[in-house]
């Protein structure tokens, strides 16, 4: 996982730039599209010499959260639990495999965790000085956290829910009311809700929520929408997979779904799911999400993590790995995959000159980074060649600290339905660690971001404030004549999750590569949850499962290599 640069501006206006993790010179901040950039601004000069808005006392929060839903009896949860038990119950290896895993995002952490559960020794290497990959976060000089993205944990994420249970940290998820709340662009400051009744089973609760909402779709539009979805309901998974070749917009025209359904529903869904608009997104992505949300009673119920992901989610996984003999190393950037004469992996060469060897190797980096690492000798192999179609989508995450508490918000995720913004939340309300009774901190996903990723931080903030003035007409003005900005952070990710455009599905690789002893993990690899945190965790489990299943072959290969003297002593 590569890093970018931290740019800052002091209150006198002097611009400063430095390498964020000490691994890239400033001039290389945007040399390649996979570098993530960070921007930090502090705007109020009167705060010079003291904390910008608050101190951090011992955490005391009156919890408004809802009880954890009963997920344990759902089929998907049980299947995910069965896969977890595969590792715990597998035969203990006579000689544990040493598996080198590159990338400590959720996919790499998951791979290492389940390999350790099976009795093997993972060596997890992270390029940056922070865990989490796409869920990474950083603490500023005031002690406030800012994140790579706005992360939501759904009830329909069975592998993540199992993972929280296995780590005994289920209480770190703050469950919210079972609703979806959309801003009304034509009625500034107003919202429309889809409330899922707790007393009804799926899919009736979802249908009820849609039918009860008369502010976004008319009855004729609802009927035509339902008729358009009938083939998916009847055809099941084969039908869903067959729609991979169509964009959402193309599917709507084919099914006779009114354009207003796109304007009122699908634009918001597309941007929330993949940070792009319906004229680009594969309809398969929408149908998979609808299937998960409608087929499981609590599938669309949302939870926030109670604090920053590196400490509250990633560190418990690291502790688990280390407690079972595994290793996790930060600041360990993969420079090159060195090969043996037969085309298999000899070792991972790090940027500091270190060579890391193992019995098996996993690349759990984002697809764009892995494509830069693919050895020339592998480039014409179909498995690797097909990856060219998989490209990360740009996204920008914006955090704004205001000088007051905003009233026109909820303790929930909100769909902005803005042309520039996707979803947002007042994190001072939704998250325990970020709780503040006096001032709001809005975290917003700025998407689609293709045209904005290279623009200045000032331009992005100005555009964001214009949109917020529509969402908070009585409280926010673009010129800050109402609520004042205390400070803000902008995190740019030029290449985030893979862009789920039509005809990508055949290009997604299995976790087991055609190169003996080499594997892939990441949400772009083949698994049923597409580009998501759930997909990343599941990909790691499937990768670890492939390695455990290949144990005999890998152990024999390692033994022969040692006897022939081809493999050096592990570093």
Swiss-Prot record:
It is found in: Plastid, Chloroplast; Plastid, Chromoplast; Membrane. GO terms for molecular function: FAD binding; phytoene dehydrogenase activity. One of its GO terms (cellular component) is membrane. It holds the Pfam family Amino_oxidase. Residues 1-96 form a transit peptide. The keyword Zinc does not apply. It is a peripheral membrane protein. Homotetramer. NCBIfam families: phytoene_desat. This is 15-cis-phytoene desaturase, chloroplastic/chromoplastic. The lineage of its organism: Eukaryota, Viridiplantae, Streptophyta, Embryophyta, Tracheophyta. The gene is PDS1.
């Amino acid at each position: 996982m590569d890093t970018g640069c931290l740019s800052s501006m002091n209150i006198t206006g002097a611009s400063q730039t430095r390498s964020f993790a000490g691994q890239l010179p400033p001039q290389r901040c945007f040399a390649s599209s996979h570098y993530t950039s960070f921007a930090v601004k502090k705007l109020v000069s009167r705060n010079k010499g003291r904390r910008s808005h608050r101190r951090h006392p011992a955490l005391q929060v009156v919890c408004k959260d809802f009880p954890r839903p009963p997920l344990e009896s759902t089929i998907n949860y049980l299947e995910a639990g069965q896969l977890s038990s595969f590792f715990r119950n597998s035969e203990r290896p006579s000689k544990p495999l040493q598996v080198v895993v590159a990338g400590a995002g959720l996919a790499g952490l998951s791979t290492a965790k389940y390999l350790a559960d099976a009795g093997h020794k993972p060596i997890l290497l992270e390029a940056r000085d922070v865990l989490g990959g796409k869920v990474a976060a950083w603490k500023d000089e005031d002690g406030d956290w800012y994140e790579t993205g706005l992360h939501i944990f759904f009830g329909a994420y069975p592998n993540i829910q199992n993972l929280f249970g296995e780590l005994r940290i289920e209480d770190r998820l703050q469950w919210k009311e079972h609703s979806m709340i959309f801003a009304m662009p034509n009625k500034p400051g107003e919202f429309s809700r889809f409330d899922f009744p707790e007393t009804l089973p799926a899919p009736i609760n979802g249908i009820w929520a849609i039918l009860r909402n008369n502010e976004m779709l008319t009855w004729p539009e609802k009927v035509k929408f339902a008729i358009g979805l009938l083939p998916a309901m009847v055809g099941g998974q084969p039908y869903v997979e067959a729609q991979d070749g169509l964009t959402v917009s193309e599917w709507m025209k084919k099914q006779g779904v009114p354009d207003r359904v796109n304007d009122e529903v699908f634009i918001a869904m597309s941007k929330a799911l993949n940070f792009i608009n319906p004229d680009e997104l594969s309809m398969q992505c929408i149908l998979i999400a609808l299937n998960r949300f409608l087929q499981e009673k609590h599938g669309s119920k949302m939870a926030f993590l109670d604090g920053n992901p590196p400490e509250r989610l990633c560190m418990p996984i690291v502790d688990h790995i280390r407690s079972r003999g595994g290793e996790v190393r930060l600041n360990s950037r993969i420079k090159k995959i060195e090969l043996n004469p037969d085309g298999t992996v000899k070792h991972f060469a790090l940027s500091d000159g270190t060579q890391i060897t193992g019995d098996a190797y996993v690349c759990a980096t984002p697809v764009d980074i892995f494509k830069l690492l693919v050895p020339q000798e592998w480039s014409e192999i179909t498995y690797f060649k097909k990856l060219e179609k998989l490209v990360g989508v740009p996204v920008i995450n914006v955090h704004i600290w205001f000088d007051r508490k905003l009233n026109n918000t909820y303790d929930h995720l909100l769909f902005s339905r803005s042309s520039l913004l996707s979803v947002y939340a007042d994190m001072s309300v939704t998250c325990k660690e970020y709780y503040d009774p006096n001032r709001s901190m809005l975290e917003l996903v700025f998407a689609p971001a293709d045209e904005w990723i290279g623009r200045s931080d000032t331009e992005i903030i100005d555009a964001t404030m214009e949109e917020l003035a529509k969402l908070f007409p009585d409280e926010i003005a673009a010129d800050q004549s109402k609520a004042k900005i205390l400070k803000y952070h902008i995190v740019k990710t030029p290449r985030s999750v893979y862009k789920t455009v039509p005809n990508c599905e055949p290009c997604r690789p299995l976790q087991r590569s055609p190169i003996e002893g080499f594997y892939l993990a990441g949400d772009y690899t083949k698994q049923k949850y597409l580009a998501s945190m759930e997909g990343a965790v599941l990909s790691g489990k499937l990768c670890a499962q492939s390695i455990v299943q290949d144990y005999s072959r890998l152990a024999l290969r390692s033994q022969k290599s040692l006897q022939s003297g081809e493999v050096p002593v592990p570093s």
